[in-house]
Amino acid sequence: MALTKAEMSEYLFEKLGLSKRDAKELVELFFEEVRRALENGEQVKLSGFGNFDLRDKNQRPGRNPKTGEDIPITARRVVTFRPGQKLKSRVENASPKES
């Protein structure tokens, strides 16, 4: 199961007593600010959680799996996430949930 923005909003509504509208707006504003920073080429550092970085990938050769034809994979910029030490430690020490 995945955590959704709707579930985050619901959690803020329940725990902080925000209205549902304010909770949803807070979640949207948070992600919009992360998105804006990355679009502007900035690193996003969330203390105790991790860092979102941008990485430029060079053009490289590829192959069409259907035809076997050689095709170039264009250069692009990708977002990477590196978890912080606190997050890594908590995940490693968490007991697995049954699905």
Curated annotation (Swiss-Prot):
Family matches, as PANTHER family: DNA-BINDING PROTEIN HU, INTEGRATION HOST FACTOR SUBUNIT ALPHA
NCBIfam families: himA, PRK00285.1
Keyword DNA-binding: yes
Keyword Zinc-finger on entry: no
InterPro entries per the UniProt record, alphabetical: Hist_DNA-bd, Histone-like_DNA-bd_CS, IHF-like_DNA-bd_dom_sf, IHF_alpha
Stored CDD domains: IHF_A
Family statement drawn from the similarity comment of this UniProt entry: Belongs to the bacterial histone-like protein family.
Organism: Dickeya dadantii (strain 3937) (Erwinia chrysanthemi (strain 3937))
Quaternary data: Heterodimer of an alpha and a beta chain.
SUPFAM superfamilies the UniProt entry points to: IHF-like DNA-binding proteins (SSF47729)
Gene Ontology BP annotations: DNA recombination; positive regulation of metabolic process; regulation of DNA-templated transcription; regulation of translation
Protein name: Integration host factor subunit alpha
Keywords assigned by UniProt, alphabetized: DNA recombination, DNA-binding, Transcription, Transcription regulation, Translation regulation
Region described as Disordered: 51-71
One GO cellular component term noted in the UniProt record for this chain: cytosol
GO molecular function terms attached to this record: DNA binding; structural constituent of chromatin
Reported function: This protein is one of the two subunits of integration host factor, a specific DNA-binding protein that functions in genetic recombination as well as in transcriptional and translational control.
Pfam name, any one: Bac_DNA_binding
